[in-house]
UniProtKB/Swiss-Prot annotation:
InterPro entries assigned: Herpes_UL24
High-level lineage: Viruses, Duplodnaviria, Heunggongvirae, Peploviricota, Herviviricetes
Keyword Nuclease (UniProt): no
Membership in a protein family: Belongs to the herpesviridae UL24 family.
Induction: Expressed late in the infection cycle.
One Pfam family it belongs to: Herpes_UL24
Function: May participate in nuclear egress of viral particles. Plays a role in the dispersal of several host nucleolar proteins including NCL/nucleolin and NPM1. Since deletion of host NCL/nucleolin negatively impact on nuclear egress, UL24 supposedly acts on this process through its effect on host nucleoli.
GO terms under cellular component: host cell Golgi apparatus; host cell nucleolus; virion component
Compartments (UniProt record): Virion; Host cytoplasm; Host nucleus, Host nucleolus; Host Golgi apparatus
Protein name, UniProt field: Protein UL24 homolog
The entry's keywords: Host cytoplasm, Host Golgi apparatus, Host nucleus, Late protein, Virion
């Protein structure tokens, strides 16, 4: 009986890891598409719309993704950084994502899912604290937004999104993106089928080519200029309120207010 229970636990762990890896690869493709077209897909809308509107993402100076970021005691599943300008005073958004996978999605209030949620919130709080120790110096406002995401193992549907209150810190957005990328320990594999592209022009025949498989950290969706690196600590509030969105019922964007990060992002583009 004990051996059977161990095998069941191992199979569940392997299934969760496979789901994590598939979701990572899907995020890379979805975010690249949103950056190009200015429209979020069904997976990214509950995660990003309230923080960075799709049209704002399209005009951002730099967007990067890093997976399994090693912060020492914690390792957030995904960190997305968005840069809105150049220089040490450029504003940006840093989204920390903790991913939880579910075999069954009908009931999101089971005891196991509640334990997953509590554990994920603790992980996010610790990750924010640890990330503060790696912040490079800079005067740019960075919105640090921790997000807990429940995903169905079948279909990779986003079931529920829970947010901690965002924090505003000051750093260099470009250097922060480079620092986080160096700490990443996982890069989604690129298959031959997905890397094959077909170039079509009006005057020449189409030609197929293959991109080389990357072995290091995943490359930013748009390149950001590096600068000098250092570390500076920042303070976070001890308590943070959670905002939960059930994506299975339907995603409803929050109204714009002073506490809404969407209003903060919109203010970046307001006329001076």
């Amino acid at each position: 009986m004990k051996r059977k229970q161990r095998l069941t636990a191992r199979s569940r762990l392997r299934a969760g890891i496979r789901c994590h890896n598939r979701f990572y690869n899907a995020m890379v493709q979805d975010l690249a598409s949103a950056k190009k077209n200015g429209v979020y897909g069904a997976r990214l809308a509950p995660l990003f719309s309230e923080l960075v509107p799709a049209e704002t993402l399209k005009t951002a100076m730099g967007v990067s993704l890093a997976f399994e970021v090693n912060l020492g005691q914690r390792r957030p599943d995904c960190v997305c950084t968005v840069q809105f300008g150049h220089g040490s005073d450029a504003k940006g958004v840093c989204i920390l994502i903790e991913l939880k996978t579910c075999r069954f999605s009908k009931n999101m209030n089971t005891a196991s899912k509640n334990l997953q949620r509590k554990g994920g919130m603790r992980q996010l709080h610790d990750s924010c604290r640890l990330l503060a120790k790696t912040l490079p110096p800079g005067s740019g406002e960075i919105l640090l937004a921790p997000v807990l995401v429940f995903v169905a193992q079948r279909g990779m549907r986003v079931l529920r999104v829970t947010r901690l209150s965002p924090q505003v810190v000051y750093s260099n957005a470009a250097v922060l993106s480079c620092t986080i990328s160096r700490l990443a320990e996982y890069s989604p594999p690129i298959s031959e089928r997905s890397t094959r592209r077909r170039c079509v022009t009006r005057r020449t025949n189409s030609k197929a080519f293959r991109a080389k498989t990357t072995t290091g950290s995943i490359q930013p969706i748009t390149q950001a200029k590096p600068a000098a690196t250092a570390a500076v600590a920042s303070l976070f509030s001890a308590t943070a309120q959670a905002n939960t969105t059930n994506a299975a019922v339907g995603y409803q964007p929050a109204t714009i207010s002073l506490a809404n990060p969407l209003a903060w992002v919109a203010s970046l583009f307001a006329p001076k």
